[in-house]
Design a protein with these regions (language model features):
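Interdomain "pre-motor" coupling segment immediately N-terminal to P-loop NTPase/helicase cores
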Residues: 18-81
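Short, small-residue-biased leader/transition segments that mark boundaries at the very start
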Residues: 3-8
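Conserved helicase motor core of SF1/SF2 NTP-dependent helicases
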Residues: 130, 134-140, 146-156, 167-174, ...
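N-terminal pre-P-loop "Q-motif" helix
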Residues: 95-109
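C-terminal accessory regions
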Residues: 389-392, 397-512
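Conserved helicase motor core of P-loop NTPases
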Residues: 227-393
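Hydrophobic anchor at the beta1->P-loop junction of P-loop NTPases
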Residues: 116, 144
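Conserved lysine of the Walker
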Residues: 124
Length: 512
């Protein structure tokens, strides 16, 4: 199973482990006791069953719960005072808030810990912007952060304030063997009065734990996210657990605003999320479904869309248009699609140097993606005259780039990642790089593209669920085109079975 659960149920783990390791159930049970004595695992009795935790996750969850509760202090500010200030901000900025958004601002002012959740078009950005302006008027120091570079960049664009990755805010120091230790922790906390973290659905338990260690009591923490996105790649489902535990105040934004209700991307995303029928008559301006039932036919349609139709339609380059697919393997999987798309978008040429690595050929001009967090890679942003404007460490899982140069002599590539970060990328790290003309929907989380194209033709039930479809559709700013079988599409909307993730954070938050 995926390592995304941080707790297992004994009656499920024992038969699975004994089958996997080809040993008897008794032998597995004996191991539990030995490991518990060595403090490698924790056995915890919950109601009628035993839960088994890796010790490191158990302590992380227990400490995360303790720290969250500690931050959850309340401040006494009157309704009238907050409302008066909101009205002033609305006047100045031309924004108007609905009652849910006003509630969110009030809760942010009155609580040390708050969760704000809502889908696309429900006014999260306006709410965050009002909260920022509010605390700014109080003269408070505000930090904005998001789990990925792309999400942080988006947050900067929508708020007009500098947002950083959580890693950068915590001052990543490379740590032992590049594991990524942070300069900021309980002995050197963040000097902020208010910290707002966006795209919380992507934050896993270990990043949450590191973040909380660096926040001192008296700092307000506001967590913003869309709980219906796919859960984080790493273990746990932090945002969902905090919401379900009722351990702190949560404001849910549900109303779709008028300007958003003309967008079928947003309207259909909410229909998918509620399990309602989506009309596929292609009368839309930004949501299309092209019915095709053969993998190769689908691929040809995808190629035409990227190269000819969509760039003009959304005013973007073919490189900006992202193909998102559910799977890695198979006729419409990432691996096969990348091979085909590469030939079509960046064909071989005499003046393009290539580097073969495993079954992939990397070529100058290729669109690529980093697939692991690498805390050691140095990057620089330079002006066109070669002056360094900014530099730093770390290229993270999901960062996209273009290969500008391949240098066999130096055994490295020059890759330009998002935001113009130039990296000397050594061949020995090519394991962490892959072509990115097509990427999995999971990898697209937290990113936004002018247009996305989603091939859909069957797939394993476990994977093809509502959250996956919802995440894919909400990646597009201007246009979503699905190409494939509408039956698969309808099945995904109906399939609400998410792979069950057990995690103990919700239980820990409910304790005492």
């Amino acid at each position: 199973s995926s390592a995304a659960s941080d707790v297992y149920k004994r009656q499920e783990l024992t038969p699975r482990a004994s089958k996997l390791l080809n040993v008897t159930a008794e032998q597995v049970e004996k191991q539990y006791m030995d490991l518990a004595i060595e403090r490698k695992i924790i056995l915890k009795q919950m109601e009628d069953q035993t839960q088994i935790y890796a010790a490191s996750f158990y302590y992380m969850e227990a400490n995360t719960a303790t720290m969250l509760k500690r931050l959850n202090v309340s401040y006494d500010v009157s309704d009238a005072e907050i409302e008066q200030r909101i009205r002033g901000i609305e006047k100045k900025s031309g924004m108007t808030l609905d009652e849910h958004q006003v509630t969110a601002v009030k809760e942010a002012v009155r609580n040390g810990l708050l969760v704000i959740t809502g889908g696309p078009g429900t006014g999260k950005t306006t709410t965050i912007n009002t909260i920022i302006r509010y605390f700014e008027l109080e003269g408070l120091e505000i930090f904005l952060a998001a789990p990925t570079g792309r999400a942080a960049k988006r947050m900067s664009e929508t708020t007009g304030f500098e947002a950083r990755t959580v890693h950068r805010m915590l001052e990543l120091n490379g740590g032992a063997e590049g594991s990524g230790g942070f300069e900021r922790d309980e002995s050197n906390p963040l000097e902020a009065d208010v910290i707002i973290v966006d795209e919380m659905s992507m934050v896993d338990i270990s990043l949450m734990y590191s973040l909380l260690k660096a926040i001192s009591v008296g700092t307000r923490l506001i967590l913003v996210g869309d709980v219906n996105q796919l859960p984080s790649v790493g273990p746990g489902s932090v945002l969902r657990d905090i919401i379900q535990s009722h351990a702190c105040n949560v404001v849910m934004l549900t109303k779709i605003f008028r300007q958003a209700s003309t967008s079928d991307i947003i309207v259909n995303a909410h229909k998918i999320n509620h399990g309602e029928e989506v009309i596929l008559d292609n009368k839309s301006m930004d949501f299309f479904f092209l019915k095709r039932y053969d993998a190769d036919v689908i691929i040809n349609v995808v190629l035409q869309l990227i190269k000819q139709k969509l760039p003009k339609f959304v005013d973007a380059t073919p490189y900006d248009i992202q193909v998102l697919t559910p799977m890695r393997k198979g006729l419409l999987g990432v691996e096969r699609l990348n091979g085909i798309l590469q030939r079509y978008m960046n064909p071989p040429a005499n003046d393009k140097v290539e580097k073969e690595y495993g079954s992939t050929v990397f070529r100058e001009g290729d669109k690529v993606m980093q697939t692991k967090n690498n805390y050691q890679l140095a990057w620089e942003i330079r002006t066109k005259f070669g002056l360094t404007v900014d530099k730093g460490l770390g290229i993270f899982n999901g960062d996209m780039g273009i290969i500008r140069q391949i240098n066999d002599f130096a055994e490295q590539m020059i890759i330009e990642f998002d935001e113009g970060r130039m990296v000397e990328y050594p061949y020995k790290l090519l394991d962490e790089l892959e072509l990115a003309y097509a990427i999995t929907i999971h990898k697209s989380q937290g990113s936004e593209y002018p247009a996305v194209v989603i091939p859909l033709l069957g797939g394993p039930m476990m994977l093809m669920n509502r959250n996956l479809l919802y995440t894919a559709v909400t990646r597009a700013r201007k246009c979503v085109t699905l190409v494939g079988n509408e039956v698969t599409f309808q099945q995904m909307i109906r399939n609400t079975s998410q792979q069950k993730r057990y995690s103990g954070l919700c239980d820990r938050l409910k304790e005492n």
